[in-house]
Amino acid sequence: WSSDVCSSDLGVDGTDGILSLLRDLDEETLVLCLFSGGGSALLPAPADGLTLADKQATTQQLLACGATIDEVNAVRKHLSRIKGGLLARHAYPARTVALALSDVIGDPLDTIASGPTHPDSTTFAYCMELVDRYGLRQSLPAPVLQRLEAGVKGEIPETPKKNDPCFSRATTHVIGNNSLSIAAAEKTA
């Protein structure tokens, strides 16, 4: 099961390729994205000072202690260069349109694929609350703990929030979800 929610080196290479395509875009550029369930694991871009192994160990520890996928994704966003609205920030000032296939109940846009083009409602402080709630302070990789603590102190910028200018040029649309899938199955059955 963990291979479905943990990332690989191929994902890092692919994500680096995406980020390189987003360099030096202008207002006339349209960035079209498609996200779906599993997108969080497929877009691993460890933040500066972190390795993929750091992120994998953190994800595995969170899952092993019973953290929800929303909690795991909150931490992932703060250990990433692309999640939690950061893809939209990298693409800015280009116009970004994301189409999402949601496997998340309620279709929260900041949760689908860890919300790479949507404002992040979580914070470094919340991530540290999770670390303490699940008793992971002693077992997480040191660079992960250092990054989260630095974020709480304001030494590292937060993930972009709803007032960030990049979101004036970014939209996300759910084009498929569990309800639509069930309705289609009922119609064809």
Where do the protein language model's features map onto the residues?
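A glycine/threonine-rich phosphate-anchoring loop and its flanking beta-alpha core
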Residues: L63, I69-R137, V144-E149
